Structures are given as C-alpha cells and as structure tokens.
C-alpha cells in the first residue's frame, strides 16, 4: 500500500474512533437514501432466507442434503460429470414396495398391489426430480445470481461510500490545517460514491418485478408437479379398486387339511414289575458333533492384514447412491481415506466406496 493509501486508512480509522467513542457527528445522508438502503437490506434478507427454505422444501432431509453435497464435492474432485441426485422419499418407498411385492409373488393379491403402488411411487419420484430441476433453473439460480451479483455490488458501493464519508469528515474537521483542494477532492469523491450507490439501489428496487416473475415460475412448477402427482395417484387408486373388485368376485378357496398319517407305537414290552414300557430312543454318539459343540461363524469376506488401517462393520449398510460401499455386520474393511468427520472411504473385496463412520468400529486408525 502506498503512503497516500496508508494516510487515508489512518484518517478513516481516526474519524471512526472519534464518532464511536468521542460522539463526534458525521455527515448525515438524506432520508430518501436511508429509506432505499433499508429496503435493499430487507430485500437481501428476504432473498437469502427464501432461498434456504426453498432448498429445504425440495430436499427436506438434512442428512441426505449433507450427504449429497459431500458426494457432489467428491465427484468434482474426481472429475466425474454425472452426480448422484437427491434420494426422493417417494422413490425409496417405491423400491421398498416393489422388492416385497416380488417376494410375495404373483399369486398374492397384496404382492400384486405392492408392485402397482411401487411403480406409481417411482413415477412420483421422477416427477419430483423434474420439479427440482425446474425450480432450480427458474427460481433458485436467478435469486442466487441476484445475491452474488447485484446485492453484493450494492454492498460494495455502500462500503466504499462509508469509507469516503469518513475520509471527508476527518478532513472537514481539520479544515485550515490541510489544503482546501484536498478537502474539495474528498467531498467530490464522497458525492460520487453516494450517487453510484443510490443509482444501484434504485435500479434494484425498480426492477423487482423480475423477482415476481421468478416467484411465478416457482408456483407454476409446483402446480405442474401436483397435477401430474394427482393423475398418477388417480390411476393407482383405480387399479387398486379394480383389484379389490376382481378379488371379491372370485370364489374363496377353502382350506382342506391333509389327512394325518397313522403313528405306530409298536408292541408294548413287559418290565419285571409287570408294567408296560417303551424303549427310549437311542442317540447316536459321533466324534464330529457333540451337544456342547457350537457352530463356528466364518467371515464372509477376506480380512485385510491388521497392520494396515482397517475397521469392522457394526451393522449392515445398504448403499443408496453411486460411490457408496455396501457391507454386512462383521465385515472388516480396509480404510483408505477419511472424507470428513462423518464419512470414510475404504475397500472391501476389491470394491472401493464411501460409508458412514457411525456404522463401523476402527481397528487400526488411519495415519495422521
């Protein structure tokens, strides 16, 4: 920084201290300017909070949001173009229904109904994904651009104006001790900054119809989503009602138990006391199995050497997104990296991926 720049910083700091501590009066801005500044500040707060709440509305699960952010960051680091999307709750419900519907089989009314409902839930998830994309392009991105460009630029002009005001007030207080030309230049710069800040705030407030247009795009996207969702659910409801009608029209199958096979107790034998008795069944002794023997559980996967970083799975973990590593309770996983305080990266049976720290117990920690 030049000597002139250092002097200017000193002037501003000195004037600020005299106002904050000494109670000195600074140059007052007009009421119209203050009113515009207040409206811009309220607009900035409104846009920031509406953005955050909109993202929560589209992606309500905070854990999934954090996980998605982490995976997207890792994808960027690895140069992967395709990023995993937010796991919609409708899609997860649909996958669950389809899985159990297939297990129950085609002869089960409930199984067939679960398959119908599962397919509809997956369609709802696809429609929700379309809503996410539409809202991001036409509402979230424009508002973020407003925050990062227009509002940020206004804050820059206001900060510059405040600095030039402090410089002007300091020199005005020392009038007679500094050249008049220096005081005149300070006043011109202050008025110039005030005009620039005023113009930028005026332009923002006068073009707020753009934000109305973006809000309208959000509502249109929601309407389109709900229309499609209603259509999908109407179709599903009709399918289920048809299944109920078909099931009620079919004759009920009566349960017929199988005939019992006769059980032969054999001829009774007389004991010395004259009472009948039956011979107790003999238990064959075997060297390969005794009652005290217990089945030995063998690990389902190969274990890494214990001299390298590793951990043991405490619970089963089913991967939900690309890049995650699935495992079963008791598996020993080789640790390769710690992504953050909640996620590890590791290898198991030649496959690499990410998994939550809370699902494992560290056996050999990663080197610091």
From Swiss-Prot:
Modification type Phosphotyrosine: residues: 315
Its membrane topology: Peripheral membrane protein
Tissues showing expression: Ubiquitous. Higher expression in pancreas, placenta, prostate, testis and uterus.
Cellular location(s): Cytoplasm; Early endosome membrane; Cell projection, Podosome
GO molecular function, one term: cadherin binding
Pfam family, one: SH3_1
Protein name as it appears in the record: Endophilin-A2
Species this chain originates from: Homo sapiens (Human)
Lineage: Eukaryota, Metazoa, Chordata, Craniata, Vertebrata
